[in-house]
């Protein structure tokens, strides 16, 4: 009988620990949301941040992007489709987060391209050919310049800008903002300041749908 009482007591204790852990996690999540809501808008978007979609959109997706990240490559068409299907209601803001080896070269080239109005063609090329230059087991950032040649980029100017203090400072600013927002992996998504609670394609779509509904009274276009 005593053994049964001990086992029952242990089971109850485990249940209580589980309940406390669940409520504690929920409380921390809610607290984080409150803290993020109090962050200045500049931590989500900077004057240099590349954008895709209407500047008048009421819903803004901020993506912390690493061009060498395979998951970022997988999400790239999904996010652009969300923008295109929403007819001016959603805008994408890109932030540079070169966590992987070789990605620092890539984001410098991307920012140099942005200075020429060529961010999206160059980014598209780097994402498309990611396996060529950004493979985890053997990154080859030295191939990046040859890959983006032919996109219409002024190569001489881009090479100068990519190693400039201005570009370096902008990448460092994005990394500092990523740290401030607790971004530790890519892609990192925020929709109107709200982070994903769970990571996944459906979760991104659902969070955008909620914000579109809140702002416009209609969900994401199919």
List the predicted regions and their residue ranges.
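Structural alpha/beta surface segment adjacent to cysteine/selenocysteine redox centers
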Residues: 57-68, 73-149, 179-184, 209-222
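Conserved strand-loop elements at the edges of beta-sheets that form or border functional pockets
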Residues: 54, 63, 198
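Ser/Thr/Pro/Gly-rich low-complexity linker/stalk segments immediately outside membranes or between
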Residues: 27-42
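A short beta-strand-turn-helix
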Residues: 42-59, 83-84
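C-terminal cap of thioredoxin/glutaredoxin-like
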Residues: 1-23, 145-222
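Short, flexible loop segments at the rims of nucleotide/cofactor-binding pockets, characterized by
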Residues: 39-40, 70, 166-167
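Short clusters of hydrophobic/aromatic residues that line enzyme substrate/ligand-binding pockets
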Residues: 50-52, 133, 196
């Amino acid at each position: 009988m005593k053994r049964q009482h001990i086992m029952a007591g242990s089971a109850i204790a485990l249940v209580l620990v589980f309940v406390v852990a669940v409520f504690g996690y929920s409380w921390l999540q809610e607290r984080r949301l409150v803290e993020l809501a109090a962050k200045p808008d500049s931590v989500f978007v900077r004057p240099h941040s590349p954008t895709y979609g209407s500047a008048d959109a009421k819903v803004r997706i901020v993506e912390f992007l690493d061009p060498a990240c395979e998951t970022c490559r997988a999400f790239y068409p999904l996010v652009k489709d969300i923008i295109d299907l929403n007819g001016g209601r959603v805008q994408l803001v890109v932030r540079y987060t070169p966590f992987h080896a070789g990605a620092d070269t890539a984001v410098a080239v991307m920012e140099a391209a942005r200075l020429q109005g060529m961010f999206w063609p160059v980014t598209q090329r780097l994402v498309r050919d990611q396996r060529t230059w950004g493979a985890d087991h053997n990154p080859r950032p030295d191939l990046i310049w040859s890959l983006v040649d032919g996109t219409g980029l002024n190569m001489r100017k881009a090479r100068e800008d990519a190693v400039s203090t201005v570009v370096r400072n902008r990448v460092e600013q994005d990394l500092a903002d990523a740290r401030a927002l607790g971004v530790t992996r890519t892609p990192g998504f925020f929709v109107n300041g709200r982070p994903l609670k769970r990571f996944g394609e459906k979760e991104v779509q659902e969070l955008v749908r909620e914000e579109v509904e809140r702002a416009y009274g209609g969900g994401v276009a199919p």
